[in-house]
């Protein structure tokens, strides 16, 4: 009997992507995050769909509809907590996935990397518009502050901001369109994920050594399906722990108050996963400069493949680059901390120094380290 999974037009695609896919024999747990992100996306879409059934995108009822979901809908509190904390898990996996790509030189698969950066931006946009929907104080003021940044664009800025708002300030029209965006974007993300995988399967996976693994490949199933399943269980364990025992620990207390345009919260700040970019934005006193730095902090990922100077792909055998990579990691944690602090000394100067170090590491120090390592590996007479 002919094996159906190898002949059926649809099953054949799944078979070549997840079952008989030749995978390097030495990929570590750092390669689990792709599948974990897939699981996160599915969880977010399913929980989001059930939330959308009960949510109303109107300024008068949005806040109370979220309260209604938590109080009156069967397991509504659980669905909402899973969705809110699922976003945090999503970004945690995203940052680790990108970090893995930088450490092991996966960015040299340029198409896959570029689609990945577009995916990151799309997920960030989705999370931003989603945070506005509960229409609490931080939702409203976060939306006001971030959309206001568009007005820094010369000539067309104010018009652009009012166009996004659908009026002269963040109001009913803004909330309605943000709900529409928040609903459609995850499906766009799903399409981009398929393109991301399509490009990845053109080249095959990278591996920790950075050496071409073609001479030693193993089938994806059962080796990596089992390994991924362990990752899913650990992810669900952490997510359920967060959602059941500490659902509000990553949120902002101000969001328990309904949005009030007449009362500004003392410290306006986004969710934790945007704090590093927010710190870079705030570290520049000029509004337009801050917006450009904010964009550059993410878009800099697009030029990382061009800054690769080392003869080796992976950082596995490059101690100088490794040191700089972990300094970059610590620097991003510092920026995340600074983003949540008030705008006063010493936080201002720490944020400015951390921002300078962030760009210096990626644009100058890491390429120089690659060149230095090449020089050190050259045979000397």
From Swiss-Prot:
Its cofactor is heme b. The chain crosses the membrane at residues 33-53, 77-98, 113-133, 178-198, 226-246, 288-308, 320-340, 347-367. Its main location: mitochondrion. It comes from the Eukaryota. Binds 2 heme b groups non-covalently. Heme b b566 binds at residues 97, 196. It is found in: Mitochondrion inner membrane. One of its GO terms (molecular function) is ubiquinol-cytochrome-c reductase activity. It is a multi-pass membrane protein. The keyword Iron applies. A ubiquinone binds at residue 201. Heme 1 (or BL or b562) is low-potential and absorbs at about 562 nm, and heme 2 (or BH or b566) is high-potential and absorbs at about 566 nm. The cytochrome bc1 complex contains 11 subunits: 3 respiratory subunits (MT-CYB, CYC1 and UQCRFS1), 2 core proteins (UQCRC1 and UQCRC2) and 6 low-molecular weight proteins (UQCRH/QCR6, UQCRB/QCR7, UQCRQ/QCR8, UQCR10/QCR9, UQCR11/QCR10 and a cleavage product of UQCRFS1). This cytochrome bc1 complex then forms a dimer. This is Cytochrome b. It comes from Sminthopsis murina. The lineage of its organism: Eukaryota, Metazoa, Chordata, Craniata, Vertebrata.
